């Protein structure tokens, strides 16, 4: 059997924890001062799908909407270059009055078509959706609650599957990943919508998977290496799982990079969230979750089971 090279991952762990602390501080400050650029799903607004008879530049459409009084419209191609998706957060005062009636969305849609048809183009209104501010607020609250519930369930699972110190380390590492990902969106002011929220939840699952694999090897090695120091057990466990972690992350990142570059504007932010989150999650499974086990003074005694249990574990 080939001997695995043991790397001293914990040697720079203090510097890595310091780096994580700085990044967390920057993220929290940015979230508190700049906030997050919420998408239509969370802030409310109107989404309209229109069709043109021939390809058209999005800048031209954006300029027409601004001149008609629609502030900061989002205009993107989807599918063919004749298919346009419009997202309007702020609408003219006259149009705002129409939102009090049941015909709000059709009325806004007709105003948009009129503005875009001013130069003689034949515009086809294909679909229109309106998200009210109250619905957006409910989605924000439910999205935040969903992330908290996910972290609570993770902590319960790891506590039952492993031990409470493992659970605390896993949840703190996941919270680290979520805060840094949210901080990334705050600093870049990329739009945060439901697809990005789904990406953040996917990051939680991906990072947890990496952490569980490391923790499972740590537990196994604590039982096998009875006279080895905890730091050496963790270094050996990380070395044994290193290539599996790197290979999985690398292949996943290749797919996400292709989505980010070629996927179009509609999934650009979704891919960006996953790219950043998986990079951070891979890092945290090594230098945050594992280091936290040492800070929590994990030892073989924490994992001891009754003799009958150990005999069962040792069976082939």
Locate each region found by the language model.
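A structural signal for conserved, well-ordered secondary-structure elements
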Residues: 1-316
């Amino acid at each position: 059997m080939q001997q695995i090279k043991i790397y001293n991952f914990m040697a720079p762990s203090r510097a890595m924890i310091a780096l994580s602390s700085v990044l967390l501080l920057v993220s929290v400050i940015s979230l508190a001062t700049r906030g997050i650029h919420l998408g239509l799903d969370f802030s409310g607004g109107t989404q309209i799908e229109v069709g043109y008879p021939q390809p058209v530049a999005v800048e031209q459409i954006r300029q027409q909407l601004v001149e008609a009084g629609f502030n900061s419209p989002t205009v993107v191609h989807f599918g063919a270059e004749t298919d346009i998706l419009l997202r309007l957060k702020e609408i003219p005062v006259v149009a705002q009055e129409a939102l009090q009636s049941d015909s709000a969305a059709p009325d806004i849609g007709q105003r948009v078509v009129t503005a875009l048809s001013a130069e003689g183009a034949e515009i086809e209104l294909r679909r229109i959706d309106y998200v009210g501010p109250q619905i957006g607020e409910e989605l924000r609250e439910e999205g935040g609650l969903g992330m908290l519930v996910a972290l609570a369930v993770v902590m319960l699972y790891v506590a039952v599957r492993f031990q409470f110190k493992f659970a605390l380390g896993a949840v703190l590492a996941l919270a680290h990943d979520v805060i840094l990902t949210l901080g990334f969106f705050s600093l870049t002011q990329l739009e945060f919508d439901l697809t990005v929220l789904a990406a953040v939840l996917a990051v939680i699952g991906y990072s947890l998977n990496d952490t569980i694999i490391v923790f499972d090897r740590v537990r196994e090695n604590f039982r096998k290496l009875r006279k080895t120091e905890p730091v050496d057990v963790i270094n050996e466990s990380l070395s044994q799982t290193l290539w599996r972690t790197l290979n999985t992350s690398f292949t996943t990142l290749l797919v996400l990079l292709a989505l980010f570059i070629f996927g179009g504007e509609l999934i650009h932010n979704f891919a960006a969230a996953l790219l950043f989150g998986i990079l951070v999650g891979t890092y945290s499974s090594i230098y945050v979750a594992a280091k936290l086990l040492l800070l929590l003074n994990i030892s073989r005694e924490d994992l001891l089971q009754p003799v009958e249990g150990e005999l069962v574990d040792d069976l082939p």
